[in-house]
UniProtKB/Swiss-Prot annotation:
Glycans are attached at N894, N900, N909. Residues 99-122, 217-222, 320-339, 880-918, 1012-1013, 1117-1130 are extracellular. It is found in: Apical cell membrane; Early endosome membrane; Cell membrane; Recycling endosome membrane. It comes from the Eukaryota. The modification Phosphothreonine is found at T717. It holds the Pfam family ABC_tran. It comes from Ateles geoffroyi (Black-handed spider monkey). This is Cystic fibrosis transmembrane conductance regulator. There is a cross-link at K688 (Glycyl lysine isopeptide (Lys-Gly) (interchain with G-Cter in ubiquitin)).
Amino acid sequence: MQRSPLEKASVVSKLFFSWTRPILKKGYRQRLELSDIYQIPSANSADNLSEKLEREWDRELASKKNPKLINALRRCFFWRFMFYGILLYLGEVTKAVQPLLLGRIIASYDPDNKTERSIAIYLGIGLCLLFIVRTLLLHPAIFGLHHIGMQMRIAMFSLIYKKTLKLSSRVLDKISIGQLVSLLSNNLNKFDEGLALAHFVWIAPLQVALLMGLIWELLQASAFCGLGFLIVLALFQAGLGRMMMKYRDQRAGKINERLVITSEMIENIQSVKAYCWEEAMEKMIENLRQTELKLTRKAAYVRYFNSSAFFFSGFFVVFLSVLPYALIKGIVLRKIFTTISFCIVLRMAVTRQFPWAVQTWYDSLGAINKIQDFLQKQEYKTLEYNLTTTEVVMENVTAFWEEGFGELFEKAKQNSNNRKTSNGDDNLFFSNFSLLGTPVLKDINFKIERGQLLAVAGSTGAGKTSLLMMIMGELEPSEGKIKHSGRISFCSQFSWIMPGTIKENIIFGVSYDEYRYRSVIKACQLEEDISKFAAKDNIVLGEGGITLSGGQRARISLARAVYKDADLYLLDSPFGYLDVLTEKEIFESCVCKLMANKTRILVTSKMEHLKKADKILILHEGSSYFYGTFSELQNLRPDFSSKLMGYDSFDQFSSERRNSILTETLRRFSLEGDAPVSWTETKKQSFKQTGELGDKRKNSILNSINSIRKFSIVQKTPLQMNGIEENSDEPLERRLSLVPDSEQGEAILPRISVINTGPALQLRRRQSVLNMMTHSVNQGQSVHRKTTASTRKVSLAPQANLTELDIYSRRLSQETGLEISEEINEEDLKECFFDNMESIPAVTTWNTYLRYITLHKSLIFVLIWCLVIFLAEVAASLVVLWFLGNTPFQDKGNSTYSRNNSYAVIITNTSSYYVFYIYVGVADTLLALGFFRGLPLVHTLITVSKILHHKMLHSVLQAPMSTLNTLKAGGILNRFSKDIAILDDLLPLTIFDFIQLLLIVIGAIAVVSVLQPYILLATVPVIAAFILLRAYFLQTSQQLKQLESAGRSPIFTHLVTSLKGLWTIRAFGRQPYFETLFHKALNLHTANWFLYLATLRWFQMRIEIIFVIFFIAVTFISILTTGEGEGTVGIILTLAMNIMSTLQWAVNSSIDVDSLMRSVSRVFKFIDMPTEGKPTKSTKAYKNGQLSKVMIIENSHVKKNDIWPSGGQMTIKDLTAKYIEGGNAILENISFSISPGQRVGLLGRTGSGKSTLLSAFLRLLNTEGEIQIDGVSWDSITLQQWRKAFGVIPQKVFIFTGTFRKNLDPYEQWSDQEIWKVADEVGLRSVIEQFPGKLDFVLVDGGCVLSHGHKQLMCLARSVLSKAKILLLDEPSAHLDPVTYQIIRRALKQAFADCTVILCEHRIEAMLECQQFLVIEENKVRQYDSIQKLLNEKSLFQQAISHSDRVKLFPHRNSSKYKSPPQIASLKEETEEEVQETRL
């Protein structure tokens, strides 16, 4: 980054913001890059601001029993805040003084006061000086207040992040990722957007008092009539605001439902395409959209009338103020025009500034209180360690994940009695609520010496991970003692990859040791994988390492744990995603050799690992089932296999530990922090028996967005959720918002705070941060470039010259240094965080406007209608102005008039009434015309938004995966959330406001020019200067906003990344390291945001200067031109002042319209995505008069009306697959054939392309070559017809928000009897019957109440219902408990006995059921043969299969020399199969 010119700028340059000129010039001439942005001043550094606020907050905590965050903020920022408030007040005072000078100028034209004509020019100079002074005071004050708001936000951002790293796991279990992102985005945005308005809470009352005093001097008691009307108007607007918020609360639930379904669709778009559910998902979302739009229109109409009431209230304010006075004392033009000017200022203070200020304080104080509560939550407590200790000891340890759960679960069980079924059976759903009321670990004892290996085993839910968490201090023991040195390293069960290079992920901020690093890489079998990357270990990994396979991610996580020099290594099932050969090699070379002198605790279920362990601890239902050596285990616990592998009969499981639908998910439910409802009520709300979604998912919009576990901000989770990446082009007051909330757009009073506890926000079901940390993370999709880098160290001291890539490319070393990737440039940051679809022009093109306008044929006619009404309004206004300008009004009782005045007429009571009747009639006409002018416009624009959403949804569903793979899920979701919200809420009313303000300014200029033609000499240059200056500014400002939005992405991405890996971060003690990274992300965003604020103020100040010059010209032309009467001069100067008061609003609206139209540009980008083929509906076959619901195609290779496929024969010829067009081939020249009904197993290392081959079969990739099914080539039929030939069980199971019935049959083709029949076949019936409502029970959060195995059964049922003849299975047994796995095995044998099955699996017993095996190595087919031939040849399969498996396969080949190992008498045959399990 460049050094900021602000550091050397003079006072004048700072006052006029001239120091921003270089960046404006560069942005106008060329495209701005991150390197062009100026460095932030040290006063804006996140390090300095956070340290300052943290010091005051600690002081507050130490000195008071009831600490207040606002006190800490006051000590940090109060005096600067008040200084700028005084400047703002002085600027506002000039607005009250201006009408006084206007009245004196008009009075100087009174025929009876010719002596005062000579002072008019001096009064004009004074009036112009007031405008100049106001300009010089107002803009520095507003900029200073925005600056303070920004600093407050940065300081609290940092404070919240630091607190997040300290929170206890119990607190994290009650906080969702959406809450944290909301805390950082929606709540803290109030300081950026509202601090400039906060001072009006005291400025507005003073302004009103001053104005009322001045109006009293003119009109006496009549002044309060106008004030009363304004107060009534404000109350009316408040009522409209409450009505609008009622509609928005109702709509929030509907928006949330749509976004939940949309986010699930985006996250699982590959599954949607594989199942051919595009039409079903589109119909489902469009139905929700229709309901949402009904409420959107109602809210928009209310907002429209609210805004219109303000615009057209001016007539009545003046009328009600002047009428009583005129009826009593007659009319004086000076008083009319002065009153009009006063009323303009008074109206703004009463109906806008003061209510906005009150709402700002209400929202800000609410946000501060919410942040304050968060900062006082329980922190993570480190255990007391003894660094000299060499052993690990646990004595009589008992622990709960949550204390005090017993009473809650008892209440839940009592309430469940009301949910018993009609036959009297207990509702099994509530039978397991007591689980968390029991200890997760109970009376655990063990001791291991230095250098020993402890293997921890047990069935699912036995407490293995909880044991590791307790050793790390994440889970506090309620009883007992834990003893170890405290120097811990940890490898999580689910791989956690942070954005950065492979090298940075392994080193993880620790000082670099070349020898140790290379040894770890070799031991973890990463050498071959790294060698395939052009940048080697310096390749930049994005969201969760999406470019890597699951096995590669697992090995990187293990390497990170091993690289750290620790006394105790905790390894939580690190081999889950590895093939058998890689697993064996890593276990031997890494765990047994490289770490031989280290103390290790390994969670495993492998018999080979238990045999080599020094000690074994088997957990069962949280208790220690066995502790000792392997030989002792065989002698003392011959039934250990059932406890180890979980082969107890399902019916024999205890009620607390039964493998039901809740056992592994209970901790996912928790209360919203401030929601005043009970846990039980929350559960009841979540599981109502109704088909409607609205009562199931009343989450906030933010939580729905962040229900995606991919964050491209982040997310961008991202809630921001993405969590979180966007080029936000909203108006200033919403620019930092991650996602649209129920309050986006212009404030309607009284606005309800984001932190409200209304019904739409009170009851929530969400996944806590703890659950996110303990479950596999769904990865985003992005493309990352490969880069090279050399490294050097720099000190940790704050540096102003850190580049934007420092966010993730520079890493702290153990000696408080940073690892810097020097050769990584800005492009790498874009690849980690930016979407490829974001390359839109800096300024909205005219083509976008034209395309938007012509999208709906009625919109053009509506715009013409608005223009006609405007011309009518101008004509009506001229009628009033003619009466005011050509009729001399005088006080009643004063009948003196000049005979020389050609217009001299004494106004009697009768004629006064006559004039005011005309005025009232014209005012009523204008009000009616104004209301009817904008209403069709708002209605039509919402219809256009509906069309855009439909087109974009259809385009995304029909887009090829090669295009979608280049986008981030958060980026796609933000199109449907943020951009659609802008199109629904902000854009229609902003366009209306802009048109209204533009017409006011144009109309005023036109009238002034008509009354005094010489003013045209000043009008033309001013208009030209405005247009040129606006174009010059927008070219740079929009680029700065893009960069600011891009800079916001790493902030939320880093937050979400930190939360996902919090246990790892704390185990490694890298909290300071991640705090520094977070501060760098904040500094990057601050640099862009601060520069945007400065350039925006530069533009607005110069626009105001231009119009001040225009006002000066108008003033002196009207004063110096002879022959003008007081009416004409009053009209000209009053309208000129009205232009000045409306100008800034109009300018801001013009900028906002251009910014919001960028959302339209982004939507058009998605609409214009290519399609992957024409979607066609399958032909329905009828047999015996009944709909068979089986696909029939018309093809030259198939006889007419033959059902296809009939056998499932596949022929693959020269198949080549690529993820993106023009990319490297993932599979090359694959050729083989599969006979009908045959089972084929896919073999290969992790990352060899097995899953890619299955995707290629479904044509989800860019493919070349040919595949035929039963003689039909994939080129001869449509894409949907081809995919319907397959049944799919993917690795990542897709369960969308909806009923069981909808999830199994989204097209509603099958009857309940048929669905229940299939549920029986696959073993799903008992699961569904546990829920209230059965098939009508609504699943939410990706089916979080279902275990992974139950979700696999859902996929199996879908495939059975689809009547598919070819079944593709991609590691269906991953993370399954043995009971569910056996159910799936049996279901596969029964339901797909005559189908072709292609299986990618790691369990040997499943693969042994295949007749043919396809071995893939180096992107090609190495072997394809039967199991007999593969066993006789040297192959991957021969190395993987054990001797015992060969004996079971070919018992007649058993050699007499071979002696089987001693058998444990009580082991069941099925259990022995599992004991000998290995992975491929």
